Swiss-Prot record:
Effect of K73I: 10-fold decrease in cytotoxicity
Gene symbol of the encoding locus: stxB
Designated name of the protein: Shiga toxin subunit B
Function: The B subunit is responsible for the binding of the holotoxin to specific receptors on the target cell surface, such as globotriaosylceramide (Gb3) in human intestinal microvilli.
Segments forming a coiled coil: none
Length: 89
């Protein structure tokens, strides 16, 4: 029973790690803009990415104003790609 539990716990940790969103770009927010399709675009480093997560907008604007460093995490790490996760540093 303990061996089965250990294997199940190991597999769940592995699958959670495999699904983790990779870092795309780290830097300061250069600019932000609202789009006609109700999305919000930010430029960090050499990437211009969008999100439809309204709860991130005020946080990203604050990061831009204060010069905070952010890390955008996404699987679509190309200009015009979308994201839904940000780390504020």
């Amino acid at each position: 029973m303990k061996k089965t539990l250990l294997i199940a716990a190991s597999l769940s940790f592995f699958s959670a790690s495999a699904l983790a969103t990779p870092d795309c770009v780290t830097g300061k927010v250069e600019y932000t803009k609202y789009n006609d399709d109700d999305t919000f675009t930010v430029k960090v480093g050499d990437k211009e990415l969008f999100t439809n997560r309204w709860n991130l907008q005020s946080l990203l604007l604050s990061a831009q104003i204060t010069g905070m460093t952010v890390t955008i995490k996404t699987n679509a790490c190309h200009n015009g790609g979308g994201f839904s996760e940000v780390i504020f540093r």
